Amino acid sequence: MTAAAATVTVAAVQPTPVFLDRDATVERLVASIDEAAASGAQLVVFPEAIVPGYPDWVWRTRAWADQSWYRRLWEQAVDIPGPVTDALGSAARRAGVWLAVGVNERVPSGTLYNTLLYIGPDGAVAGVHRKLMPTGGERTVWG
């Protein structure tokens, strides 16, 4: 006899980030988490690097042509743990959902990582996965 598979309701959410504005983007994510949970989602998934936005200039400019973009990304990147994980954790706990959120993570050494952040329904960071082999122009920004 086999056990019945559990059904999990997943919400794939793609709100527009407020580009290079971490706090405003997180506010949008929190609203989306609440909406997805109200619709029955148990797992809410967001895109790659949504906080504070994907650095798409890497595909349009010469490498290192304009350091101001990198500096702005660094200033708005996410510390783990930190205020962003606290805000997302509170939203996950309130909604009772799992989260998978793509962020630009900064570390004290000065490196930025394209990171997937997992947060459990208890509000705690359950896991962190860094994209360690960025491709093409992404290598001028991440890891």
Regions found by a protein language model. Name each.
Residues 6, 39, 93-99, 110-113:
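Short, basic and Ser/Thr-rich N-terminal targeting/leader segments
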Residues 7-19, 115, 128-130:
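Active-site-proximal beta-strand elements of phosphoester/diester hydrolases
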Residues 14-32:
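N-terminal phosphate-binding loop and adjacent alpha-helix
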Residues 16, 50, 104-105:
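Catalytic metal-binding/acid-base residues of hydrolase active sites
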Residues 67-86:
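A short acidic, glycine-rich active-site loop
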